[in-house]
Amino acid sequence: MKIVIAGAGEVGTHLAKLLSKEGLDIILIDNDENKLHAIDANYNLMTMTGSPTAFKVLKNAKVDKCDLFIAVTPFETRNIVSCSFAKKLGARKTVARIDNYEFLKPEYQQYFAEMGVDDLIYPENFASLEIRTALQHSWARNFTMAS
């Protein structure tokens, strides 16, 4: 499976590390060459310096052949636009990190689908799910009650 990840921040780097350990074909795109060099030296993945909203960068990353394009830069609009471009170039599935919870409303899903964004990630949802799951375990309840 070929996966292209746009954004070498905490989320993108974590995803790239995890997925590369699974033996998947990973390309990580970011503007910061120093970040990419540090990651490239330690993990089995390919890195590419550039903007995920530049057609040249997306074409060089061969998004037309990727099974999954994940945009997790710190900028919501960049994530949406890069997913839209990747989808138009042939990416099979696209996922964009967002900061606006309103975008998750069912009535807006069609808009994103029409733009080429298949799924949205709202990081705060993951945090709340993890907290809820932790509180269901006795060790977490005991820890929070003791504090």
Task: Show the residue positions of the predicted features.
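Cytosolic regulatory regions of ion transport systems
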Residues: M1-S147
